Amino acid sequence: MNALRTFAAASLLSVVAQAALAAPVPFAGSLAAADPIYNRTLAGNPPGALSAVGTAVSYDVYGFTVTANGSYLMETLSAAFISGTADDTFITVYQNIFNPLAPLTNALQADDDNGPGALSTITRSLNTGVNYFLVVTSFDNRQFGPYTGRFDTVTGGGQVIVGGAPGALPEPSALMLLPLALAGLALSRKRSAA
């Protein structure tokens, strides 16, 4: 019975520690005429064809990994493009490599308007040990301007690491539970010793 209590306390501690690391990771950029261009894909899971509208869109690429297998959210939160629909973003997530000359190769999922308004959102399962690339672009050619977005953990307790560096500090609410978990572990050990 004591071993079961110790195991339960250790499991609780593990869950609390993982939850403490699952913080949103913001990103921000700006699409400009001087950026590289490519023929983006159509939306899909996975995308199956190239766009006939977004044939020469500027893009930014965010390389990232995850620290635990789980479900992760990638989304644009705002955009202020100076032509076309002001917030019409388009995102694609790739695994292993992104090659703008072969935009369908390694494309896992692409989204146009699943976020609010014309913003983009992808939620998908990702695994540790894989390099991923989020490509942020516009729906139409020659749409330039700033945008913001974020990565977030949905399930799994892992953290998104953008460009090889942790993106955010642990959540304060989860860290406040850590002393409670440690106290429970100490109490179970004290009872088992008696």
Task: Locate the predicted segments by residue.
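Bacterial N-terminal signal peptides
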Residues: 10-16
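Bacterial N-terminal signal peptides that target proteins for export
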Residues: 1-8, 172
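Short, charged juxtamembrane terminal tails flanking transmembrane helices
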Residues: 191-194
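Sec/Tat signal peptide C-region and signal peptidase I cleavage site
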Residues: 18-22
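Beta-sandwich interaction modules
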Residues: 118-124
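A short, hydrophobic C-terminal helix/tail in secreted or cell-surface proteins
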Residues: 170-188
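C-terminal edge strands of extracellular/lumenal beta-sandwich accessory domains
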Residues: 23-49, 54-67, 93-107, 124-167
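Extended, low-complexity, turn-rich repeat/linker tracts enriched in Gly/Pro/Ser/Thr and Asp/Glu
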Residues: 79-88, 142
